[in-house]
């Protein structure tokens, strides 16, 4: 992989009766900005009645998971939530969404959940990809660009 890029893996074991493996590929710029280039999911959710709906649910969950992992912070001021709506609560926009591949494992087991698993695996996959790209482990969500900027600046200020 080129410098500043990395892949991260996350596994969801029997969440909502579904097994899911997710790989995220990200790029972290010298300024600490994160760009998600691609997400691949393998999903075993038991008997699949409508594969298109299963794929769409996983894709939507991944998009929501990226938004939450990168920007999903709710702050309080004087006991009230500051984020009133999407004008001040950042979510991934359509033109920012990476390609998302969903591979379905077909079997005859009982159907499991499909809405949540894509979301639940996204933050760990992104965190591991950021670590692979930078060597820096972030241990708090959201994976804030400010934290990455600080870490990237620290690295450039170090002498060899």
What residue ranges belong to the model's regions?
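Cofactor-binding beta-sheet edge motifs in enzyme active sites
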Residues: 1-160
